[in-house]
């Protein structure tokens, strides 16, 4: 684990403005350095306010940006539960390339879906310029959950960038299998940021960081493996 810096804000709106500014800086720096930016983007509801601030930035050349969901539900690409669908709706009109983790021929086989996603990701240039993570109240990140798939998703085969997982227990709001970027893929990024809200999630994150590589919370396991500075954006 490298340096961790906390950025604290009174409101989610203030946090979103700062986070969007930092994401924009990473994008512009990556475009200047190697002609394009590759960003892994968290699902969930917290990123929505950041998306608005990002889209208001008229300086970003989205035609040179590739967006990859950190994870996705094993549903059709136009399903309301699809992270790809949200990114496509928001950013494809700006010219960004959106990479899907889901192959609709494998919706009934999460392990095959993970293999196909891994093949697709191999076509990208690695490492990613930025991994933008959220976190669940149980400490899960992307679709790396506590439970039977934790070790395989966090520290599985080093050559795998994506795997299929079956959360146990299934989340009540989206009881479906998932495909997720692996801990190896996430930890290899040039920059990492975590964006969370609320006192409960802050307590979970601080506890997981303190537990280090032995943590049973996915976020703790992942942070212990990251070798670049981590920026944590938090608001009440």
Feature locations, PLM:
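ATP/nucleoside-binding phosphotransfer catalytic cores, i.e., glycine-rich phosphate-binding loops
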Residues: 181-184, 188-236
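Class I SAM-dependent methyltransferase SAM-binding "motif I" and its flanking Rossmann-like core
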Residues: 137-183
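Glycine-rich beta-strand-to-loop/alpha-helix junction loops that act as flexible
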Residues: 41-46, 133-137, 197
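N-terminal glycine-/serine-/threonine-rich phosphate-binding loop
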Residues: 1-39
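A glycine- and small-aliphatic-rich helix-loop capping segment at beta-alpha/alpha-beta transitions
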Residues: 53-62, 85-89, 146-156, 211
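Ligand-binding beta-strand-loop-alpha-helix segment within the catalytic cores
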Residues: 1-3, 62-132
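Short, conserved loop/helix-junction motifs that constitute active-site signature segments
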Residues: 58-66, 153-156, 184-189, 223-227
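Glycine-rich N-terminal segment of FAD-binding domains in flavoprotein oxidoreductases
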Residues: 28, 32-56
């Amino acid at each position: 684990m490298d340096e961790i810096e906390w950025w604290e804000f009174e409101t989610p709106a203030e946090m979103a403005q700062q986070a969007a500014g930092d994401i924009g800086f990473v994008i512009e720096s990556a475009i200047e350095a190697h002609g394009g930016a590759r960003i892994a983007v968290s699902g969930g509801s917290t990123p929505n306010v950041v998306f608005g601030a990002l889209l208001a930035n008229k300086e970003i050349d989205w035609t040179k940006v590739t967006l990859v969901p950190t994870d996705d539900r094993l549903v059709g690409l136009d399903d309301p539960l699809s992270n790809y669908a949200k990114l496509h709706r928001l950013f494809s009109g700006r010219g960004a390339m959106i990479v899907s983790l889901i192959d609709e021929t494998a919706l009934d086989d999460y392990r095959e879906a993970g293999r196909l996603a891994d093949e697709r990701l191999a076509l990208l240039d690695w490492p990613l310029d930025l991994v933008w993570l959220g976190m669940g109240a149980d400490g899960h990140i992307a679709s790396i959950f506590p439970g039977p798939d934790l070790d395989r998703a966090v520290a599985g085969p080093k050559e795998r960038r994506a795997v299929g997982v079956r959360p146990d227990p299934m989340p009540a709001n989206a009881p479906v299998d998932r495909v997720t970027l692996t801990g190896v893929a996430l930890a290899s990024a040039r920059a990492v940021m975590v964006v969370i809200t609320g006192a409960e999630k802050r307590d979970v994150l601080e506890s997981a960081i303190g537990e280090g590589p032995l943590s049973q919370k996915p976020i703790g396991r992942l942070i212990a493996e990251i070798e670049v500075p981590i920026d944590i954006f938090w608001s009440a």
